[in-house]
Amino acid sequence: MEFSTKALDWAKAGALAAKSDCLVIGLFESQTLAGAAKALDVATKGLVARLVKLGDFEGKRGTSLLLHEVAGVGAARVLLVGLGKEADFTDRAYAEAVRTALRALASTKAASVTWTLTEHTARDKDTAWAVLTAVTLIREASYRFIERHPELKSKRDKNGTGLRKLVLAVPAADAKTASVAAARGTAIANGMDLTRDLGNLPSNICTPTYLANTARQIAKDFKLKVEVLGRKQIEALKMGAFLAVTKGSVEPPAFIVLRYEGGPAKQAPVVLVGKGITFDTGGISLKPGEGMDEMKYDMCGAASVLGTLRAVAEMGLKQNVIAVVPTCENMPSGIATKPGDVVTSMSGQTIEILNTDAEGRLILCDALTYVERFKPAVVIDVATLTGACIIALGHINTGMYARSDALADALVAAGKQSLDTAWRMPLDEEYQEQLKSNFADMGNIGGRPAGSVTAACFLARFTEKYDWAHLDIAGTAWKSGAAKGATGRPVPLLTRFLMDRG
């Protein structure tokens, strides 16, 4: 899908003459016509005003009206999209308008579109935000896994999007920043697509080795540095917690380090650590069979940090960013780790593994110790860590834990800006009491109360040497039911966070 931006002056004659399959125009409710809507009304000798007067189209949120072969317009179709009341035109209202337009376009054969919704900026937002957000939302809605991996079905699906080329209309004064925003939106969408592909692939394809090869391909495509450690190297590093999770599987584990060096050599890096459990049976603490197929998504943290690195590299951000991915399967077998086993982590702290299904924190804790060597400015781990986070926050907000208020505020702000929201959760010291063990420095679970919080508190014990945040994406990484599939979150949040850092 190709995006471009174009400065259009609606006051000039012929502004609507450009040929395309559809011209998309936004209209506010109970508002004097302006911009593209006014130009259309003038070109059609009052058609828009008559439609409003007759009540056929009032500009209400979530509504649209498709017109064909409108005189004076170069496009084969005109799609009017309701924006609601201008005073209530928030970022979410803007996103709703984009999605409303896409639903209407899906019922047509339109391939080329002139898109003017980008002339309407949401409250407290600018044109660059409108362009970037439109591009990411359009690409998000257009994603079709089977179109990208047709080998997985014997017959091709016929429900793919027909959109191929979109020209985003912007004010002349914003033309330069809008062009940059469109490119950045495309980069973010490409990162999300990679994240979704990795999540959606079955676990017999997306193995730890597959993730490692994906990192190598990203490194090749964007001239990044990559290192993949195998079992012997992991053993040499004394990552006892990580190794405990790997014991039950025949798939070899991997420890991936992917470096993007876009900033000065002396700039401390931002390190993103992604949980890469490519399939999670729960191990000896076996999960119920129903819904276990969705445990292929337990590597979405890893997928998202790889997707973020890809986006950052394509954008060419002036940052140093490192993705670290511990990856393996969690399987039961005769040699698998058992409940009650005690292991020594890379940090030297000992852990009583009370539940082998709380494995994500075990592979992450060693990774969080490993990244100390980078002397990071910030470390953010991303993981489908706890079902308890879904109980607490549902599928709207990612659970976010942070040691410092400044980092927490920056992540919350990035989530709001990207429409990929996170909600800060507590890390009070009192929760650490639940992790006490009679047989080791700590247990790997703290009981049912505050399960997401105690999981984060467990990780906090391994992050005292740097500024750290934890994103629990168990409720936001994928959808179940008819819309089953990976979402690509939190790539938008993470990329916005990095963009905001300069």
Curated annotation (Swiss-Prot):
Origin superkingdom: Bacteria
Gene Ontology biological-process entries: proteolysis
Cofactor binding note: Binds 2 manganese ions per subunit.
Keywords: Aminopeptidase, Cytoplasm, Hydrolase, Manganese, Metal-binding, Protease
SUPFAM superfamilies, per the entry: Macro domain-like, Zn-dependent exopeptidases
Pfam family, one: Peptidase_M17_N
Cofactors demanded by this protein: Mn(2+)
Gene Ontology cellular component list: cytoplasm
UniProt catalytic activity: Release of an N-terminal amino acid, Xaa-|-Yaa-, in which Xaa is preferably Leu, but may be other amino acids including Pro although not Arg or Lys, and Yaa may be Pro. Amino acid amides and methyl esters are also readily hydrolyzed, but rates on arylamides are exceedingly low; Release of an N-terminal amino acid, preferentially leucine, but not glutamic or aspartic acids
EC number: 3.4.11.1, 3.4.11.10
UniProt subcellular location: Cytoplasm
Residues that hold Mn(2+) 2 according to the record: K275, D280, D298, E359
Record-linked InterPro entries: Leucine_aapep/pepB, Macro_dom-like, Peptidase_M17_C, Peptidase_M17_leu_NH2_pept, Peptidase_M17_N
Sites where the protein binds Mn(2+) 1: D280, D357, E359
GO molecular function, one term: manganese ion binding
Residue numbers annotated as active site: K287, R361
Keyword Hydrolase (UniProt): yes
Tagged with keyword Repeat: no
Role description: Presumably involved in the processing and regular turnover of intracellular proteins. Catalyzes the removal of unsubstituted N-terminal amino acids from various peptides.
Family named by the database record: Belongs to the peptidase M17 family.
Protein name listed in UniProt: Probable cytosol aminopeptidase
Source organism of the structure: Ralstonia pickettii (strain 12J)
